[in-house]
Amino acid sequence: MALNLQDKKAIVAEVNEAASGALSAVVADSRGVPVAAMTVLRKQAREAGVYMKVVRNTLARRAVEGTEYECLTDTFTGPSLLAFSNEHPGAAARLFKDFAKENKDFEIKAAAFEGAVTDADVLATLPTYDEAIARLMMCMKEASAGKLVRTIAAVRDQKEEAAA
């Protein structure tokens, strides 16, 4: 479909706005993936707070100029599906990683976080806020139990020395 200049400018502005407010970005190739599966992916992306759009490579390069995702311009070859995570840095990577397990033709090209290209698997394994809090609480709980055991052992040792 031919796009006139106004449509191209609108697409660039829309993607640039999404990139400016995003926490991370993922680029993927969706060649060979059935339309029904892509529709499901788009629905899951909306639910996860992920902005997703298929953009021409030239327009994608222009859209990410001046943003922290300019490092992704080398990956814009072939069909490019852009996804920007708005709520959690690992949301798009996690979504794409799960989708790639079910659809063998779906390929994750690259991911970016804080202005640098990074491995999508690393982004996908980032804990959510609630998971991070739970891990922190577990560590604190384990540390206090360890201190209690050491304190009781020290008291026992003191009593044994006093009795001897």
UniProtKB/Swiss-Prot annotation:
Keywords: Ribonucleoprotein, Ribosomal protein, RNA-binding, rRNA-binding. InterPro entries: Ribosomal_uL10, Ribosomal_uL10-like_sf, Ribosomal_uL10_bac, Ribosomal_uL10_bac_type. One of its GO terms (biological process) is translation. GO terms for cellular component: ribonucleoprotein complex; ribosome. It comes from the Bacteria. GO terms for molecular function: large ribosomal subunit rRNA binding. Pfam families: Ribosomal_L10. Forms part of the ribosomal stalk, playing a central role in the interaction of the ribosome with GTP-bound translation factors. Part of the ribosomal stalk of the 50S ribosomal subunit. The N-terminus interacts with L11 and the large rRNA to form the base of the stalk. The C-terminus forms an elongated spine to which L12 dimers bind in a sequential fashion forming a multimeric L10(L12)X complex. HAMAP family: Ribosomal_uL10 (MF_00362). Belongs to the universal ribosomal protein uL10 family. This is Large ribosomal subunit protein uL10. It comes from Aliivibrio fischeri (strain MJ11) (Vibrio fischeri). The lineage of its organism: Bacteria, Pseudomonadati, Pseudomonadota, Gammaproteobacteria, Vibrionales. The gene is rplJ.
